[in-house]
Amino acid sequence: MERSLRKKRIGRVVSDKMEKTIVVAVETKVRHPLYGKTVNRTTKFKVHDENNEAKINDRVSIMETRPLSKDKRWRLVEIVEKAK
């Protein structure tokens, strides 16, 4: 039950240069409070990748987890789409 309360996101891998860690950029659409235009916001997350299986430009699903280091609070769930 508790696992379903964790946040899930889908994003693209922008860096895989670290050992067991990838950087995932997640895009969200937000309406501008004054002008009403839809703006794309990008947030980068450091994600734990135990087997180093995700590569750059892969589309991945990530899930919130306990703090694993100073910046890492997400873990890789699955690779949705491999890079071409």
From Swiss-Prot:
GO terms for molecular function: rRNA binding; structural constituent of ribosome. It comes from the Bacteria. NCBIfam families: PRK05610.1 (NF004123), uS17_bact (TIGR03635). Belongs to the universal ribosomal protein uS17 family. It comes from Clostridium beijerinckii (strain ATCC 51743 / NCIMB 8052) (Clostridium acetobutylicum). Transmembrane segments: none annotated. PANTHER family: 40S RIBOSOMAL PROTEIN S11 FAMILY MEMBER (PTHR10744), SMALL RIBOSOMAL SUBUNIT PROTEIN US17M (PTHR10744:SF1). One of its GO terms (biological process) is translation. The gene is rpsQ. CDD domains: Ribosomal_uS17. Part of the 30S ribosomal subunit. Gene3D superfamilies: Nucleic acid-binding proteins. One of the primary rRNA binding proteins, it binds specifically to the 5'-end of 16S ribosomal RNA. Keywords: Ribonucleoprotein, Ribosomal protein, RNA-binding, rRNA-binding. One of its GO terms (cellular component) is cytosolic small ribosomal subunit. This is Small ribosomal subunit protein uS17.
